[in-house]
Design a protein with these regions (language model features):
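Ligand-binding pockets and gating/stacking loops
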Residues: 1-462
C-alpha cells in the first residue's frame, strides 16, 4: 500500500482535518526548533517584571471618530459649517452632534454614546495622541496589527505568543474572533515566525457571532482512540520526512509546526467545545454583556468568549467590531456602533475585575486611525492618521488618566504623540517583554515587532 493511499485513508479522521485546518498556512523556512517560544508548553520569557499576563484587543475596524467618542472638541462644535483647515477647498468643519460630560472620580470626558462604559471611566487610560503612517484602510489596518504597512510581518498576537508561550497546552494561545474577511489573514498570521504562532480564527466578519465557531474541533464519527491512531499515522509520516532528510530540510520548521498543530488540535477536543458554549454562563453574566439584546448580541458574544479564553489561559485574544468608516450618515451610524460596543465592553471590564483578572489582563481598544474634523459632506468624516484616540484598561496601566492631546479640532496630535510602534512597545512592556530584545532571525537579519522604532510610553504605566 502506498503512502498516498494511507494518507487518503487517514483523511477521514480528525488527524488530517487538524493538519489541514490548523497547519495549512505553515509555510516559508523558519528558524529551526529551539528558538525562544518554539514550544508552547515552555515557561514564559520575562525580560523584566510583567504587569499583564494576557491581552484582549477590542479592534474597531474602519477608524472610529475620536471627536465624537472620547476626545471632545468644543471649538469644533462652535465652528461647525466653517471652511475646513488645510485640506483644500470644499471641506467644512463638522461639529459633534453628541454631548460630552465628565465621569468618575477622575473626571474623564466621554460622549453620551456610552452610558455603560462611562461607569468604568476610572479604569480607562485614554491616549489622545495616537498617530500612524497611512490613511488607507488596508495598509493602516495591517500596520496596526503587524507594525508594517508595506511588508508581510508577524502579527502582534503572534509576537506575544512567540515571546510568552502558551499558558494552556490544550488551547491555542492566540485567538482572533470574527476578523474582517476582506482585510486578510495576514492580520492574525505568523508570517516568517513558525506557523505554531499564527492566530486561530473563530468565525469571520461574514457570519454572525452567534454562529462563530471552530471547524473540526470534534469528530463524532470516531472514538478518541481511533482519532489518536489516525493522527499518529499522519504524524509518523511527517516525522519520517522530517528526520530522514539530509541536514536541515528546507521547510523542516514548517513540518515541525504542522506536527505540533496537529497535536494541539487533538488536545483541543477536551476543552474548546465547553469554552464555546456560552450557555454555561449564568443568566446574570449573559445580561451583563448584553447577550440577547438587539444590536448588541453579536459583539457581546465576542467579548464573553474573550473573557472565557482569557480565563482558560489564552495569551492574546482579539475581538472585532467593524463599520466605523462613517464618511456619511455620521450620527445614526455612530449611534449604532456605540450601542453595539457600550454594554459588552463595559461588561467585559466589570467581569474581568470581579473575577480578579483585570489586574493582569491588558484590555486595548482602538482602530487603524481616527477621523478628520472636516468633510465635503456635512454628515460624515474622512480618514485621519495624524491624531486619534485609543484606550487601555487593566494590565498595569493608570486608570482614570489621559495622555497626549490633539489640536482644538482633533486634526493632529500636538502633545506627546504616540506612534503605533510606541503603542506596540508599551503593550509588550506590560507583558514583561522588551521590544528591542524580542527578536527572530529571518532573511539574514533580526526582526522585531517595532522594527528599528518604538519607545515605551511610561507615562501611562502605573
Amino acid at each position: 500500500t502506498s503512502r498516498r493511499h494511507l494518507l487518503r485513508s487517514a483523511a477521514a479522521g480528525f488527524g488530517w482535518l487538524a493538519f489541514r485546518g490548523l497547519a495549512a498556512d505553515a509555510g516559508g523556512a523558519p528558524t529551526p526548533a529551539g528558538t525562544p517560544g518554539e514550544s508552547t508548553g515552555r515557561p514564559a520569557i520575562r525580560h523584566h517584571r510583567a504587569t499583564a499576563r494576557r491581552v484582549i484587543f477590542l479592534c474597531m475596524q474602519g477608524g472610529p471618530s475620536h471627536q465624537d467618542t472620547f476626545d471632545p472638541k468644543p471649538r469644533l462644535r462652535r465652528d461647525h459649517g466653517k471652511p475646513g483647515p488645510g485640506r483644500g477647498r470644499g471641506t467644512q468643519l463638522v461639529g459633534s452632534p453628541f454631548a460630552f460630560r465628565q465621569h468618575g472620580q477622575s473626571g474623564l470626558w466621554m460622549s453620551e454614546l456610552f452610558p455603560h462604559l462611562s461607569g468604568q471611566a476610572d479604569r480607562l487610560c485614554m491616549v489622545h495622541s495616537m498617530r500612524t503612517d497611512i490613511p488607507n484602510h488596508p495598509q493602516a489596518f495591517t500596520q496596526l496589527h503587524t507594525g508594517s504597512a508595506r511588508f508581510v510581518r508577524p502579527s502582534l498576537g503572534s509576537w506575544v505568543l512567540y515571546g510568552l508561550g502558551s499558558a494552556n497546552e490544550n488551547l491555542p494561545g492566540f485567538i482572533s474572533i470574527s476578523p474582517p474577511a476582506q482585510l486578510g489573514a495576514a492580520n492574525y498570521g505568523s508570517a516568517f515566525l513558525p506557523a505554531l504562532y499564527q492566530g486561530t480564527r473563530i468565525g469571520s466578519g461574514r457570519e454572525g457571532s452567534s454562529e462563530a465557531g471552530m471547524s473540526h474541533v470534534t469528530q463524532g464519527q470516531f472514538t478518541t482512540g481511533q482519532q489518536r491512531r489516525q493522527l499518529d499515522l499522519v504524524q509518523a509520516m511527517n516525522r519520517e520526512r522530517l528526520d530522514g532528510a539530509p541536514g536541515a530540510e528546507p521547510g523542516g520548521g514548517a513540518i515541525e509546526a504542522a506536527i505540533q498543530a496537529g497535536e494541539l488540535a487533538f488536545r483541543m477536543q477536551s476543552e474548546v467545545p465547553d469554552l464555546l458554549d456560552l450557555g454555561r454562563e449564568s443568566a446574570a453574566t449573559r445580561a451583563l454583556y448584553g447577550i440577547g439584546e438587539t444590536g448588541v448580541d453579536g459583539f457581546a458574544r465576542q467579548c464573553l468568549l474573550a473573557r472565557r479564553f482569557a480565563e482558560a489561559g489564552a495569551r492574546f485574544i482579539e475581538v472585532n467590531l467593524g463599520g466605523w468608516d462613517q464618511h456619511q450618515n455620521l450620527e445614526a451610524a455612530l449611534r449604532k456602533n456605540a450601542r453595539a460596543l457600550d454594554r459588552p465592553a463595559a461588561g467585559l471590564i466589570a467581569d474581568l475585575d470581579a473575577r480578579g483578572l483585570l489586574d493582569d489582563t491588558l484590555v486595548l481598544w482602538g482602530g487603524e486611525f481616527g477621523r478628520t474634523p472636516d468633510s465635503r459632506q456635512q454628515d460624515g468624516r474622512d480618514h485621519n492618521h495624524r491624531g486619534f484616540t485609543v484606550w487601555m484598561a487593566g494590565g498595569g496601566v493608570r486608570g482614570g488618566t489621559t495622555h497626549g492631546r490633539t489640536d482644538e479640532y482633533g486634526a493632529q496630535a500636538i502633545e506627546d504623540p504616540v506612534h503605533i510602534h510606541d503603542l506596540h512597545a508599551t503593550l509588550l512592556h506590560t507583558l514583561g517583554l522588551d521590544h528591542e530584545r524580542l527578536t527572530y532571525r529571518y532573511g539574514g537579519r533580526d526582526h522585531r515587532l517595532t522594527d528599528v522604532h518604538g519607545t515605551v510610553v511610561r507615562a501611562v504605566l502605573g
